[in-house]
Amino acid sequence: MRLATSSLCLFALLLALLIAGCEGKERTSAGRPLDREEMRAAVAEAIRIPDTVEHLARIADLAGRLTAENAEGAADAFDPEIAWVREYDLLPFVHAWTRVDDAAALRRVLEWSSASKRGFGVTEAIYYLALNRDIAKARVHAESITKPRLAEAAMIGLARGWAQSDDLDGLSQYLGRVEQGSIRDQMVRVANGTVALYAGPDRLREWIDGMPAEGLGGLRTRAFRTALGQMAFKDPQWAASWLSDFAGEPFASNMVVAVALPWTERDPHEALAWLHSLPFDDDVAVASRRMATRWIRLDPAAFALSLERAEEGRIRDAMNEAFAMHLVKSAPGAAADRALQIDSSERRIDMLRRILETWGRREPEAATSWLEQADLSDALRQELASRIQSRSGPARAIGASR
C-alpha cells in the first residue's frame, strides 16, 4: 500500500498544531457543541474552501469540536466525496474520532468506497489509538482485520504508533512473532523510521543493537539491514560508523553498497575515500563498481577526472570496469581501451572478453581491427578472435591482409 509522503507528514504536523490551538480555544469559548447535521454541513462547506490556509484552519477547528455524538455527521459529509477528498482533510477527523470512539471510527472507515482511502483511514485510526490510548486495544483492532491490504495497513499503523512509545522491547517481541514476509518487512521499515524521527538515530541504533542476535525470526538481521539502508540516505557517515561495528558479521554482509550509493549521491569523493579506508573484499569490490556506475550517471566528467587521479589498486580497477561497461554500447573501442587500464590480469581479461563478445556481435570487423592492434599476448588475441567469430560468423583471420 502507499505510505504517507513527506508532504503529507508536513501537513499532519501543521494540522496537529492547528488542532491543539483550536481545542484550547474551544475549551475557553461558550459556543455550543454542533449536532450531527450541523457538523455534516460545516464539514461539507469546509472541504470546498479554496484558500489553503483558511481551508486547513477550518478543518482543524471542526476536528477539534468532534464528539461521539456528531462524528457521524462529519463522515456523512466525507462519504459522497471520498474518491476525491484529500487525505489531509481526513487525517484530523480520523484521529479525533478515534480519540472519542475508536470502534465506531474504524467501522466507518472500513465502509469507505475508495480502497486507497480505506487503507489510509485504517492506518491512521490504528496509529492514533496505539499512540495515545492503548497499544493492546490497537493490537486487537489490527488483528481483527483479515483482508490482506487492509491488514497490512493496520499493522503499519500499529508499528508506527507503538514505535513512539516507551515499550520498544515489547514491539521487538511482537515483530518477532509476526510471520516473515512483506507485512513484517513494512512494519520493521516503518518502526525504524519512526524511532529515528522521534527519538533520534542513536535510539534506533540502541534498540536494534539490543535485540537478541538469535531468535525472533531473524528480526535483528532484518531490522539492522533495513535501518542501515534508511539511515544511509539521511546520514551516510553515521551509517558507515554503525556498519563498522559489525565488520565481518554475517548479518552485515553485502551492506557496504547500501551506504556507498546514497553517499555517492551526496558527495562521491567522500564515498570513494570511505571505500578506500575499508579492507578490500568482495563487498567493497561490488560497492566500488556500483558507486562508480552511479557517479558516472550523475557527473561523467567529474568521474573521469577522479579516475585519472586515482591511486593504483583494486578500487581503481573496479572503477575502470564500471567505466568500460558504461562505454561498451556507445563507444566499444573506448571501452576496450579502458579495460586495458585494469591492473588485475584476471579482471582485465574477463572484461575484454565481455566487451569483445558484445562488440563482435554488432561490429565484428571493427572489433577484429581493434584486436589486431591491441597490446595483447598472441594466445589471448587468438582466444578473443575466436569469441568474436563464434558470435558473428566467419571473420578474417587475425593478421590477414585487408
Regions found by a protein language model. Give the residues of each.
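Bacterial N-terminal signal peptides that target proteins for export
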Residues: 1-10
